[in-house]
Amino acid sequence: MVSLLRCQSFKPSSIICSLALSAAFALSGTAFADESKPAENKPATPVVSPPKATAPSANKTQVRFTKTGTFDGDSVVKLARKLASKPYVVLKDPMPAGLAKLTYDEYRDIRFNPVSSIWRDQGLPFQMQMFHRGFYFQDLIEIAIVEANQATHLAYEPKYFTAGEVITQALPNDDIGYSGFRIHNQLNTNGVFDELMVFQGASYFRALGKGNAYGLSARGLALKTADPEGEEFPIFRAFWVERPSYDSNLIVVHALLDSPSVAGAYRFSVRPGDNTQIDVEATLFPRVELSKVGLAPSTSMFLHSLNGRHDTDDFRPEVHDSDGLLMFNGRGEHLWRPLANPRQLQVSAFSDNSPQGFGLIQRERNYASYQDLEAQYERRPSLWIEPVGNWGQGAVVLTEIPTESEIHDNIVSFWKPRQPIPAGSEYHFAYRMSWGDEPVAKTNSVVVSRTASGRADIAKATPRRLFVVDYHLNGTMPDELPLAKVESSGGVISNVVIARNAANNGYRLAFELEPEDKDLIELRAELKFSTPRQVETWLYRWTL
């Protein structure tokens, strides 16, 4: 059985930092979005190549990590190990006061000039653009370009950026560094370099599969998520981006992570496609024992759907970046847990041993379900995490935070190891991320396609709840009708009905729940066939 943690109620102040960072990062993918333009063999204006190493200047920002010099696969690991051997230092880098006070509209008015994109003049399959510092993004992030085992520090160049009419102040000439970067690739159309991936804000990053629009995000590491004393947000302080090959569909990014509790070295091997794959290799060097740590964390948004529209006044039927948490556990079960926007913060932990995969999924791909011409939620990518090797005992943790606005990311998932990671140790782990419409391979299986609920009596108000769960069959529907088994941790289940659903090439399960005096009930539904068949198990947490 699935082991679940009882939810705890926390003061709103404990999650404000999380919401602010998530909202800020949500802006980063669009704040600098320029119109995609075809690749040109001969740009109309002079091309700016990656800068060479320059002599130190009084106006140059101190380079701490990405110093020009030799670089190999162990360079970042050595830096992280050395960093963790010393007490954590809060880095403060000078920045004109006006940049810190920029409004959202002013900040998005600072745009990277596509003509200055790194590698634009070299005919490579990838290009790179940097983000300016300012607004919420005030940390200086160091960046280096790696070629032939040689790292070259990428100094700030004001000529890389243009300022529109909204921002009134001039851009600085001093080397103030960058706040992050994004990678472009001919993901959707030959000759057009679209955004593929963004690194900006703490340890946040996100990517796209073919045809996707930015939605959920990932992080390098989660620490103390939903902790009453507040969450700790590690930061990627520096990046080393390897120059891609002409004939390769691969770009490699190295990153140095730091926080009061831990330092770490990360390697991201990125392969764009229908489902963009990112192989992540990480080594953590804890300064303190990590007892509240989350590996491979994802952050998303769920406002409402047919699964729950309480107190909703919205013309759109559904509003979410993800609609469910999918898990393939070590026992071979496939579990589907619809997301919710609860009235109180909820934390669920799904115990496992050697997980095979988990991720926040956007399963509903129909525009009619969202009716939002601008947000295009049907294009938001799913994110599937496949552990490499045996991750041992632990739990997939799901955090659902109440929100009244879609600008706030309120969903977090990650893997929490059962045993704390000791201080002074070296902890290595690896996993594959798949970003796209369908990152999980289809099989001849039965999957949950829709969850809806409402009051059980349409004639009058009642506390009794009706649940409707639709299943879709990938393949030919068998003649037999499966048996339905519904369990609950409290209340009374009644009127369980299973029927064929020709419109969905599958089945519809309906049942009623009488909560009685409970304010939180765990639900579990299974379909049983006479012959072996992979069927998703439906899980749900009902709350008042």
Swiss-Prot record:
GO function term, MF aspect, one: catalytic activity
Domain of life: Bacteria
Main location: periplasm
Region Disordered, annotated ranges: 36-58
Pathway, per record: Glycan metabolism; osmoregulated periplasmic glucan (OPG) biosynthesis
Signal peptide: 1-33
This protein's GO CC annotations: outer membrane-bounded periplasmic space
Location in or out of the cell: Periplasm
Swiss-Prot/TrEMBL keywords: Periplasm, Signal
Gene3D superfamilies: 2.70.98.10, Immunoglobulins
One biological process term in Gene Ontology: beta-glucan biosynthetic process
Main function: Involved in the biosynthesis of osmoregulated periplasmic glucans (OPGs).
HAMAP family documented for this protein: MdoG_OpgG
Similarity comment: family membership: Belongs to the OpgD/OpgG family.
Name under which the protein is recorded: Glucans biosynthesis protein G 1
